[in-house]
Design a protein with these regions (language model features):
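N-terminal beta1-alpha1-beta2 submodule of the flavodoxin-like/Rossmannoid cofactor-binding fold
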Residues: 1-114, 190-221
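FMN-binding flavodoxin-like domain, especially the glycine-rich phosphate-binding loop
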Residues: 99-221
Length: 221
């Protein structure tokens, strides 16, 4: 049996990509952090809109010998390096995450990761072995997204592709659909309970190691 780790040494990086302070996405971030905190693990929040993160990958950020990240990316890379669980929270806009989230992938997660390394199936030195949790939301229903091929495209591009390209240990994706203004508080609370359960499960995996599939709820995708 795996010896439990000291929870105070376990860190989660929560990357939030929604501009609305009163949004359900912000509620997800707060709830996840609160639940992980109850388990005495550490979370750090990177609110991309709050810090006005620049999503544009500049020419001098392309992976070349002597690569040196810009200061904002260097600080983000330090956050990633310290974390074992990367948590992405974003809405689906026009079938994809917001540009600010894609820019985070380009500039931070993909920093100094070359096409040659990608084609050779070499994992990212910064991300290999880390775990990814995604919470996404959409105003449209899940069946509507599936009918138009958007759900499959997103899953392949952000779940399967990123996990394999960067050498992540796993990806657990929970999606909440039909998220619109004026949601019934009971509906919101039901969804936030799913967030709490997911936070507990992911924190447990980090502390105790991989658990038998029967003890873990299956990913919601």
């Amino acid at each position: 049996m795996t010896t439990p780790r000291d929870p105070a040494t376990i860190r989660h990086l929560v990357v939030l990509g929604h501009p609305g302070l009163d949004s359900f996405n912000h509620a997800i971030a707060r709830t996840y952090r609160e639940e992980v905190g109850k388990l005495h693990q550490v979370t750090e929040l990177d609110d991309l809109y709050a810090r006005n993160f620049d999503p544009l990958l500049r020419r001098d950020e392309l992976p070349v010998p002597g690569f040196k990240p810009r200061p904002d990316v260097a600080s983000s890379l330090a956050q990633v390096d310290a974390a074992e669980m990367l948590v992405l929270i974003y809405p689906i806009w026009f079938g994809m995450p917001p540009a600010i989230v894609k820019g985070y992938v380009d500039r931070v997660l993909g920093a100094d990761f070359s096409p040659e390394e990608l084609k050779a199936d070499l994992p990212s030195a910064a991300l290999q072995g880390k775990r990814l949790t995604i919470f996404s939301t959409s105003a449209a229903s899940r069946p509507w997204l599936e009918e138009r091929g958007q759900w499959l495209a997103l899953k392949q591009a952000f779940d399967t592709y990123l996990t394999r390209a960067f050498g992540l240990a796993d990806c657990h994706h929970v999606h909440f659909d039909s998220i619109v203004p004026g949601l019934d508080p009971r509906f919101v609370e039901e969804h936030l309970e799913v967030v709490r359960q997911t936070a507990r499960e992911r924190a447990t995996v980090l502390r105790y190691g991989d658990l038998p599939p029967r003890l873990l709820r299956q990913p919601d995708f």
